[in-house]
Amino acid sequence: MDSIILKNHQKKPIEFMKNNRGVILYHSTGAGKTLTAIYSVYQFDYPIIIIGPKSSKKAFTDNIEKAGMDISRFTFYTYTKIKMILESDITIFKNMSVIVDEAHSLRNENMYNLYISSALMLASKIILLTATPVVNYFNDLAVLVNIVRGEDSLPTERALFDQMFYDEETMTLINAPILFNKLLNTISYYKIIDTINYPTSESHIKQVEMDHLQIDEYKYYIKQILYSNENVPDNVDIFNINYGLLPSKKRNFFLNVTRQLSNVAKIADTSPKIEDIMKYIISGPYPIVIYSNFLKSGIYTLAVRLEKENISYKIISGFVSQDKLNMIVNNYNNGLFKVLLISSAGSESLDLKNTHQVHIMEPHWNESKIIQVIGRSIRYGSHISLPQNERKVDIYRWISIFPNQYRNISADEYLTTLSQRKMELWNKYNQIVIDASIENNYFAK
């Protein structure tokens, strides 16, 4: 094999795997998880299966070749493909080493994910890669811990997990010592603190007042969803919404549609938010990444404006083939176009270079998703070809608010606050994860 110099945070999980069945590789985006994973399993004689989104195949192939490894020992399957195979062969992982990229995708225990989780119990060695082990709920991590342990160590049902470890009324964690013991030595944790090889970044919160078309559509959804199309008394301030008191199903549906209109009204082709984003795009510097959870009311709307301004761009979404995705990323990294528009489905496993601006068009339910998106542009060596004074990424988070006369909280503002509160709680939970990691126990001096 070629003499790749592994970093200390990569050597520890590789060493850990010599005497253990598996580990969750919870390392920052851009920390070299792919390389760590392939070295961790290549030291054994088992054939190696890699499972991941189609966008991660090239990164694995490139790293395997860079390391001078025998690529014939590796077989790559997308999540979709492995689910099809498991329908006829549940023992495919027996006597195999398995790497699962973006392993948080297994958090939802639907039928196909249960197939994968159950089948992975037969693997001889297992490495689960994720920069975001908790996406929506704390029990997301339980599925991964159980796979690594090869047994049901933690409850995966959300209600039971919360009953054991989370007090919803006070938003505090409980039974921390029990949780610590369940997590002990199942996770390798590493957070990037390198200030030399990574670009600096600065975040900017940009609030934009909605126009009258957005306000009218907002009223429509309030009446249709929250009041079920019943007549609303004239003296009721329909914009005064206590989101926390709404039934969860109704609240989630309402927030989903209002997040979309916060970008642009259905009957419009632009909005104050779109126009303000365009000002930053036109001014540069390039290249620029734009993220939206929505296609029609986000990515596509902005693409039309870019066309009108004759600004070069490409789109990465769930509809883009692997070959085309690789070509787009390569062209972006070589400065062949100015703006990259990415959707939620297209945001995983991208390795972007020299990005100067990242725009988050609307808030997300969970801060971890946004952190993951930003991490695609802030990576080890991502700006190394630029002069030192140009190695900076400006991050713009866009929030639509009501005009002053309404004095109410918009859906964007509510989601931003909710995401921040969940992040504060997650930080406490995350500290338990860190304390239980192999770095603080198995390798503790």
Curated annotation (Swiss-Prot):
CDD domains: SF2_C_SNF. The keyword Transport does not apply. Its EC number is 3.6.4.13. GO terms for molecular function: ATP binding; ATP hydrolysis activity; DNA endonuclease activity; RNA helicase activity. GO terms for cellular component: virion component. Its main location: virion. PROSITE patterns: HELICASE_ATP_BIND_1, HELICASE_CTER. It is found in: Virion. GO terms for biological process: DNA repair; replication fork processing. ATP binds at H27, S28, T29, G30, A31, G32, K33, T34. It is an enzyme of class 3 (hydrolase). It comes from the Viruses. It catalyses: ATP + H2O = ADP + phosphate + H(+). SUPFAM superfamilies: P-loop containing nucleoside triphosphate hydrolases (SSF52540). A motif (DEAH box) lies at residues 101-104. Keywords: ATP-binding, Helicase, Hydrolase, Nucleotide-binding, Virion. Residues 273-442 form the Helicase C-terminal domain. Residues 14-151 form the Helicase ATP-binding domain. InterPro entries: Helicase_ATP-bd, Helicase_C-like, P-loop_NTPase, SNF2/RAD54-like_C, SNF2_N. Belongs to the DEAD box helicase family. DEAH subfamily. This is Putative ATP-dependent RNA helicase L538. It comes from Acanthamoeba polyphaga mimivirus (APMV).
